[in-house]
């Protein structure tokens, strides 16, 4: 298995905030616009067909049997991996970046999780249970879930090897090694608040109330498991830009003139927890 940094660490580059600017566009009459739209529609339909083909191949991946027993903590008590399915045969699991040393969940993961409440019943009707898993103790997770107003199931792997076995988390000494010859780990862990405002991705670490190494030790991952004849199998997993499928706001922003407006390379520093946005600016 790889030990390279993946996930949030790949695309977090902390910002200097600026006013969003509307790009210049050619102005045409409705007939010319319709012609241009129809040209784009051909490409969109091709992409849809390719996406359907890819989804079929994704479903056709071989299954990996999970032979080790894992027990995670939930608000209702300890649960085995099989029990997390809640009587269904398919389990979608989002590894939410919230380590034991965090005081709050990752802002990017929080923005993703905002969409989970609304899909739970729809997924249950399709024989799918959706759950988040983090390494923070269950008490921290429950308190944060109440703050955010979420009701999806959330399990703690605090005293389990689960995250490490599946590389949803990385040992701190491994993370420190990523900075050898670049930024000494001891300096990263002693960033001043001012340095944390501009260091990449120290701002998100500071937002979580933790140090950079502890922040990067957690990896956002979307995984799928199935339960068949009492055995649990992993059928799919993705991270980094593969997570955009659950970042619903991106699908909407990709269709407005200003787009994601994150620059090059992509800089998602605008993301906040939903109770932290400047409401006057939002209006």
Task: Describe the residue ranges of each PLM region.
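Catalytic nucleophile loop
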Residues: 124-141
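Residues at the C-termini of beta-strands that transition into short coil/loop
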Residues: 134, 156-158
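Non-globular targeting/processing and membrane-anchoring segments
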Residues: 2-91, 96-126, 143-149, 153, ...
